[in-house]
Regions:
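Catalytic cores of nucleophile-dependent amide-cleaving enzymes
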Residues: 5-107
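Active-site-proximal C-terminal subdomain of hydrolase catalytic domains
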Residues: 61-181
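Short loop/turn segments at strand-loop or loop-helix junctions that form parts
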Residues: 1
């Protein structure tokens, strides 16, 4: 119709600056809008991950995005990026709905990664971070004494396998011969 409805779509902004040579390299992805250009830089869309990792190359990967609106906003949840990563083989994807306070998202990421390193599953690690910093960023913000919160609370969503964990890497046994007592 005359008044099209427009909505945002999650993208990942790359630090790579666009150029004519790089445009040729990304040619087909640019034509199909799997890669787009914003302010002279490339961005990848969910379609990029669906295409580039369609054979499961992200197997056993845990993805944690601490960016704003990675999973959309309250009235327009958008799981396209998470679903593309899961379709590419990622075991689990964690991201935020709504705009998130940077210090809250960084604290949540730090806590989650530390508890993954301690052997917890992604579900357990995210739950620990939420118990420590709050289930959303407004809980954290008001606990810090904040007086002017933003409009909508940002909260994490976990998609995929909540029991996924970091692989346990076994140290190889020391092959050096043990010296026997004489």
């Amino acid at each position: 119709g005359l008044f099209r409805k427009l909505r945002t779509e999650p993208v990942i902004l790359l630090t790579e600056e666009s150029s004519m040579t790089r445009d040729l390299f990304y040619g087909f992805d640019l034509l199909t809008h799997r890669v787009i250009k914003i302010n002279g830089r490339y961005c990848v869309t969910a379609g990029f991950f669906k295409n580039a990792y369609r054979f499961g190359q992200l197997k056993d990967t845990l993805v944690y995005s601490e960016t704003c609106e990675f999973l959309g906003v309250d009235d327009s949840i958008d799981l396209s990026m998470a679903n593309a990563l899961l379709a590419g083989g990622a075991s689990a994807v964690v991201g935020y709905v709504n705009n998130v306070y940077t210090v809250y998202s960084r604290s949540m990421l730090w806590d989650t990664v530390n508890y993954l390193i301690l052997g917890q599953s992604i579900g357990q690690a995210v739950a620990h971070a939420q118990a420590t910093y709050g289930t959303d960023d407004l809980v954290w913000y008001t606990a810090q004494g904040g007086k002017r919160p933003h409009a909508a609370a940002a909260y994490t969503m976990l998609l995929g396998d909540a029991d996924a964990a970091l692989p346990i890497i076994e140290e190889p046994a020391d092959k050096a011969p043990v010296q026997q007592a004489a």
